[in-house]
Amino acid sequence: GWYLFIALFTLYSGFTLANIAQLSWASFIAPEYDERTKLLTLREIIAIIATLIVISIPAVIEIYEGSFILKINAIGVFALVGIPLTIFLGLFFLDDKRTASNYDNPLKSFKRFFKNKTLNRLVLASVLLAFAQSLTGGLFVIFMDSILELGDYASRAIFVNFIFAVIGIFLWRYIGLKFTKHFAASLCLLYAGILFLLQFFVVLYISDASESVKAGVLFFVLAMYGISFSGAAPLIISMVADVSDAEQAESDVNKSGAMFAYYTTITKVGYTLAVAFPYIFLESVIGFDITLGSDNSQFTKNTLLYMYHFIPVICFFLASYILSKHNISREAHSTIKENIS
């Protein structure tokens, strides 16, 4: 037990720290408004392609009726090879030049960030997005098994979702470049909320259909929802970088690293709550038993169905509204950059 805790804590902490450094680095590599949109959406595309490679492993094993343990072990072997290779490439093949700039104490910066309304709107939107996506991700296999009785299709369904996520990023990237980042991100989350609400009614409609019909219809709905899956996150990150420029123009201190640490730390709260809350509520409050699958009571299955759909829908709509109020446009950012220089 302790070995697993320490291993996961170390791995997750290292990933988080590397992620903060990478996001902060992006604000230096792409200092202009549209350059950041291009860079961070490209980063997301590469990340999803890498994710597709990983999730294709259990999907392929699933087709050949491999066991659950075999799926987990295969991903573990991939990680054992991939992580050291990534570290090696990052340390020895990436050119990183230190730039001269004023820096501030991160803890002192955090106090200032708590008062930054523009930043905190983005952070709140990110927390809502993280909570919604983490909740649906954590409950997806349970939902497929207990509600639709399609547990054997779960890995392939996730694979379809991620394929269309790659396609969707190009759409939201185009809208962000054509109009503004906050408009594209807000529209993306509005679309996600509508699609997830539609999925709820589709699930009710196909609940008594044959297995093949349920799988086909659900795959189509997941594909349409997948278009929105990774569209908002890179745009929000790009907007945080713009806010760090505004902060630097005001204080003459570069706080991008501290700001992304602040943003990432609070966003992780959304992920953490979404992982813990559903299982505690389902098992301890309403008595849902994961091991029973579709044999759970109708009340507990209905609770799962409503929780799985309506909590994310509310989060998506709220985040969409919050992002629509963002106040740093392309023109405003140009003025900010002039003040820095």
List PLM regions with ranges.
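Membrane-embedded alpha-helical bundles of multi-pass transporters/translocases
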Residues: 1-341
